[in-house]
Amino acid sequence: MGPMIRGDRDKDTICAISTPHGVGGISVIRVSGPQTLNIVSKICQFLPAHPESHKVYFGNLKNSQTGDEIDEVLATYFKEGRSFTGEEVIEISCHGSPLICQTILNQLVNLGARPADRGEFTFRAFMNGKLDLVQAESVLSLIESQSQQAAKLALRQLKGTLSHKLEEIEDDMTWILAHAEASIDFSTEGIEVIEENVIQVRLKKIEAGLKELVATFKVGRLLKDGFRIVLTGLPNVGKSSLLNLFLEDERAIVTDIPGTTRDVIHGDTTFEGVKFTFVDTAGLRDEATDLVERIGIQKSYEAQNESDVVFFVYDIEKGLGAEELQILESLDPAKTYILANKTDKIGGSKPLETVEKTLKNSKFFQKLADPAAFFTRRVFFVSALDKKVRSEVLKDLVKEFADLQVENTVLISNARHFENLTRALENTQRSQSVVAQGLGAEFLALEFKEALIAIHETLGKRFDDQIMDRVFKEFCIGK
């Protein structure tokens, strides 16, 4: 895709299929631009000369040259200023035959429309002030959402919850910069425009707001992309059986032979509206001599590094021995859960004290930030034969990471937003230091202007080709 900022090309009338490609009951072809009605009325002659906005018209779509009927369609008209793009738009609902869709597109192009680029409809909505850049990105997030919570988060951002929060911060930033610039202008006259303590109060307010948003990125990303959970441990401890239990599907082969799992096995599921990707890996053992198994073990370590959560699984009958402790000590405690499996073989007992006592002298225990909380929240006694395990473990996992409710919370889930807001936070903190050291309004304005630029780039009030390409290249054609 070429640069999104194209001058005269943005005045073209564009067209594309907005529904997924392939055979279906219906397809929707979207047309947007100054010549929309003029072009579409030549193949949809049933449209009146002055159609009503948001009204649906029914009729036969015909070849503009021969008059042959192509399809029976519905044409929905949107007046300029009242459409998604802000331009005059007509959406043609036709039967979902790829042949019919392509025939209609060919007719539109022959009459002067241009095939739309990726994300060009949303780009035009942004350029015409119908959406800011955060909202434009949320359109893509909503389209790609794979769980209820991800869809809720994207919809809230589309409605402007994050944008409104950023605009509040922007207002405070603008106030500080305006007073800093005024202080520079009046400095020669010895007039103090605003006291330093007032500036510091505003800066602290901005810092608090930015910190709050930046801190939500981990939860926001988990809501958007889901949890990636890796099952790890020695061979033949029941990892594959647990994978099948969590996925509610016989995805992995289960045998009593150690080393059955040679490759990384993935599977997705949802629980309480949150997406989970489970990854089963080869059992970890030093004495593996088979080349394929050794490669599988290497992939196991790679999967652990890329995960959000690691479920360390061990056989409760055998207990936590030297090999188990060696694996545990290689894991990051911040994302590790212990699953003591095969409790059905010991009568369903849950010897938490034994686990705690065994781990107390380990390097893993020494790395725990809060040992008491870890043993209370992150040690599960499970059996792959018990279907209740799935809900018990996942419910606690969701509860610990966050009360993942997005209705009343402003979250960020986009890496670009996180980068920009982190930059704005750092500039704000440096600005506080400038004021504290009494370096003057010139240095404050110079430093703090960068913080405001970061907010403007997030909202799309300041942009260039590189930013636009980064945002809109992910869109499909037709959106």
Swiss-Prot record:
Cofactor(s), by name: K(+)
Coiled-coil ranges per UniProt: none
Keyword tags: Cytoplasm, GTP-binding, Hydrolase, Magnesium, Metal-binding, Nucleotide-binding, Potassium, tRNA processing
Location(s) in or outside the cell: Cytoplasm
Binding site for GTP: 236-241, 255-261, 280-283
Root EC class: hydrolase
Entry's cofactor comment: Binds 1 potassium ion per subunit.
S-S bonds: none
One Pfam family of this chain: TrmE_N
Main location: cytoplasm
Binding, Mg(2+): S240, T261
Residues involved in (6S)-5-formyl-5,6,7,8-tetrahydrofolate binding: R30, E91, K130, K479
GO molecular function, one term: GTPase activity
Enzyme Commission designation: 3.6.-.-
GO cellular component terms, A-Z: cytosol
Gene Ontology biological-process annotations: tRNA methylation; tRNA wobble uridine modification
PROSITE patterns tied to this protein: G_TRME
Residue span(s) of domain TrmE-type G: 226-402
Binding site for K(+): N236, T255, I257, T260
Similarity comment: family membership: Belongs to the TRAFAC class TrmE-Era-EngA-EngB-Septin-like GTPase superfamily. TrmE GTPase family.
Subunit structure comment from the entry: Homodimer. Heterotetramer of two MnmE and two MnmG subunits.
Protein task: Exhibits a very high intrinsic GTPase hydrolysis rate. Involved in the addition of a carboxymethylaminomethyl (cmnm) group at the wobble position (U34) of certain tRNAs, forming tRNA-cmnm(5)s(2)U34.
The protein's name in its UniProt record: tRNA modification GTPase MnmE
Species assigned in the record: Bdellovibrio bacteriovorus (strain ATCC 15356 / DSM 50701 / NCIMB 9529 / HD100)
Gene: mnmE
